Every structure is written in C-alpha cells, then in structure tokens.
C-alpha cells in the first residue's frame, strides 16, 4: 500500500488502488475535501459531504487508509491546512 502525504501536490495512482494518507502536522488534523463540484476520486465517503479527516501527528504521523475509485481520469481535491503547496491538489488515476 502506497503512502500519500496530505499536503503533497500532484500524484498518480492506479484505479482501485489502496493507499494510506499520512499527516506530518503535529498541530492540526488534515481535512481532505471535494474541490467545488469536481468528481470525488476516493471510494469513501459515498455521499456528500465528501470529506476525510486524517488525524494530526502525535508520536508518529497520523494516517488514514483510503482507496481510489475505478474510473481513470484526472481528479481534483482540496487538503487543508496545506497552504504552502496550494490547492486544489491533483490525482491522475490510470
């Protein structure tokens, strides 16, 4: 299972791929959310609001298991608080 840092920018994945969100911030939970009306690229949650919470780092980074949907395309999402690398983020599913 691949690790994806919540504040990283663009990344690639394979349809249906399992991965783990990783949050290195020791002060804030990370919130992954839908970018406007763009399609949601993850299998959970299955209904709005499309948000995921990755816990903050305590003794080790916060993590959350996740999975990409089965439709190849370029998708956009927002992760906060990750202002230094900007939003929206991009995942390309092949």
Feature map (PLM): residue ranges:
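Asparagine-centered strand-capping/turn motif at beta-strand->loop junctions
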Residues: 22-25
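Extracellular/periplasmic metallocenter environments
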Residues: 48-94
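Low-complexity, intrinsically disordered short peptide segments enriched in small/polar/basic residues
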Residues: 1-3, 29, 88-90
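Short, surface-exposed beta-strand/strand-loop-strand elements in extracellular ectodomains
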Residues: 29-42
């Amino acid at each position: 299972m691949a690790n994806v840092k919540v504040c990283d920018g663009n990344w690639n994945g394979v349809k249906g791929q399992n991965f783990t969100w990783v949050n290195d911030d020791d002060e804030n939970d990370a919130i992954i959310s839908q970018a406007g009306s763009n399609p949601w690229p993850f299998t959970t949650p299955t209904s709005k609001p499309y948000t995921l919470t990755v816990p903050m780092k305590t003794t080790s980074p916060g993590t959350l298991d996740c999975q990409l949907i089965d439709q190849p395309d370029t998708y956009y999402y927002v992760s906060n608080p990750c202002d230094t690398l900007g939003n929206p983020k991009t995942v390309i599913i092949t």
